């Protein structure tokens, strides 16, 4: 098994709408020793507006936004080529810090919008993990595992910059992609060194299939969770093997063994439904596709409240839960009802194409066309747009052409796309994406807030930076005002 540790810097925090600005990644061998590294940056396409805050965090100035050697499309192509090359010889685990909910989502959606297979991390034998999950589990078992500091709420700070700095690593250029990648490797390397017997256990759940296999084969185990600023251990038992997944989200459901399961079994269906609303919850969710940490039951048995209960009783409860198919069916039926009720209250607005990655896979025909489309020259790319079965793919292809080769677009098509971009970025409504007005408000607030210095050394330095990116967005606004 090899590892690719990686990090992205983007122009926004919303994964449906952000764009990759920079990537850093390091290939490591099975012993977690570096083999190769890669870093690249691209220009921001001018059909979208960045957030001022994101650019301040990763110090992306106007020159970096506009003068990098690579276009956005070229960078996405390079990332795909590199990831495929590095993982071609043997299965590879992709690891980012807090990556499951951000970096992985961004790369999936960027690939989706670039007419590529979005699931490069967890297909063809590859799997993905999250360094933050490992760090949280390591602290749950040993709060002294790494040097750390407390945050404003008095909890251990799990921020990568903080952990790297306090454990002797260079963190002064944090929020540049390669530095964050290096420090992810450094922090994980320390944990591997200090908890060698746990390292493989931390990483074994990098695939959904492995997690589901554990649910079917084991009666009880320790799971780690993080909430209210603390890592916690729970001793849990999975539901019956025939029905242990959430019926909608497909995440495993387990029962906290501090609860008397026989009392739960005795509840009527309506009583059970009410019980599932109570806190603390007897039912816990294991997000099977998000690299949960699952460990031997002995770890949770050492902590309160499980250490006050007879181990034989805990094992008996686990066996009863695992073998009660009716209870599992009732729980899953209630979860189904709850999910349907929630869906009825959600917005009925049609989603934008950028928000639809999880509404369906590309057809075999469109997947075949993806490769041909990327190999074609710009004029042939234009001619191929109407061959896609899925309108989303034609839409994304046209946006790539608008940004990369606008001169080959028919005038009517160019004007139509430009009007659509203008409607978005010049909107004065509250939108899901960043508008020009959103940017100006953000920029003005940052000018006035002396507490938000990011990594700028002086206020004058910050103001000069903000003036530069403000000019960039003003020019963008002028470009689209006549659309």
Regions found by a protein language model. Give the residues of each.
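Short, glycine/acidic-enriched loop or turn micro-motifs at the edges of active sites
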Residues: 10-12, 100, 133, 183, ...
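Short helix-capping segments at alpha-helix termini
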Residues: 32, 114-121
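Acidic, Mg2+-coordinating catalytic module of metal-dependent nucleases/exonucleases
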Residues: 93-100, 105-106, 144-209
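Conserved non-catalytic scaffold segment of RNase H-like nuclease domains
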Residues: 1-112, 157, 167, 265-400, ...
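Active-site-proximal helix-loop-helix substrate-binding element of RNase H-like nuclease domains
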Residues: 42-58, 62-65, 126-179
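Short, surface-exposed basic-aromatic patches at helix termini and helix-loop junctions that form
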Residues: 109-117, 190-193
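Mixed-charge, glycine-rich, non-catalytic linkers/tails in nucleic-acid processing enzymes
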Residues: 118-131, 192-219
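Acidic catalytic cores of enzymes that act on phosphate-bearing nucleotides/polynucleotides
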Residues: 204-286
């Amino acid at each position: 098994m090899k590892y690719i540790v990686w990090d992205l810097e983007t122009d926004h925090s919303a994964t449906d709408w952000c764009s990759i600005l920079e990537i850093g990644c390091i290939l490591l061998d099975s012993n977690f020793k570096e083999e190769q590294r890669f870093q690249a940056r691209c220009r921001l396409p001018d059909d979208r507006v960045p957030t001022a805050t994101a650019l301040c965090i990763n110090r992306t100035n106007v020159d970096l936004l506009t003068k990098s050697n690579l276009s956005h499309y070229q960078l996405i192509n390079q990332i795909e080529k590199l990831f495929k090359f590095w993982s071609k010889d043997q299965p590879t685990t992709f690891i980012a810090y807090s990556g499951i909910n951000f970096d992985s989502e961004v790369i999936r959606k960027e690939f989706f919008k670039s007419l590529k297979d979005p699931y490069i991390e967890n297909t063809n034998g590859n799997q993905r993990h999250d360094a933050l999950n490992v760090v949280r589990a390591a602290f749950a078992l040993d709060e002294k595992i790494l040097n750390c500091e407390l945050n404003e709420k008095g909890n251990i700070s799990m921020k990568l910059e903080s952990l790297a700095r306090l454990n002797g690593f260079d963190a002064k250029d944090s929020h540049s992609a390669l530095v964050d990648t290096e420090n992810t490797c450094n922090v994980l390397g320390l944990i591997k060194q200090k908890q060698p017997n746990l390292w493989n256990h931390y990483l074994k759940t990098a695939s959904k299939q492995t997690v589901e296999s554990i649910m079917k084969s084991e009666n009880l185990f320790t799971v780690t969770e993080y909430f209210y600023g603390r890592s916690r251990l729970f001793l849990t038992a999975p539901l019956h093997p025939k029905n242990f997944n959430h019926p909608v989200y497909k995440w495993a459901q387990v029962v906290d063994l501090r609860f008397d399961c026989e009392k739960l079994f005795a509840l009527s269906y309506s009583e059970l439904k009410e019980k599932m609303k109570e806190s603390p919850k007897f039912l816990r969710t294991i997000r099977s596709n998000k690299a949960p940490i699952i460990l031997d039951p002995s770890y949770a048995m050492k902590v309160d409240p499980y250490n006050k209960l007879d181990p034989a009783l805990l094992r008996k409860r686990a066996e009863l839960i695992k073998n009660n198919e009716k209870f599992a069916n009732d729980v899953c039926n209630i979860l189904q009802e709850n999910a349907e009720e929630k869906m009825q209250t959600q917005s009925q607005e049609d989603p934008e194409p950028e928000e639809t990655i999880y509404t369906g896979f590309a057809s075999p025909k469109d997947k075949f066309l993806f490769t041909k489309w990327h190999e074609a020259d710009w004029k042939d790319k234009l001619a191929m747009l109407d061959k896609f079965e899925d309108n989303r793919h034609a839409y994304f292809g046209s946006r790539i052409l608008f940004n990369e080769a606008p001169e080959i677009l028919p005038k009517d098509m160019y004007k139509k796309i430009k009007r659509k971009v203008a409607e978005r970025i010049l909107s004065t409504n509250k939108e899901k994406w960043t508008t020009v007005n959103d940017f100006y408000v953000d920029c003005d607030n940052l000018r006035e807030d002396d507490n938000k210095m990011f990594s700028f050394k002086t206020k004058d330095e910050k103001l000069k930076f903000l003036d530069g990116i403000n000019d960039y967005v003003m020019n963008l606004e002028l470009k689209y005002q006549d659309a």
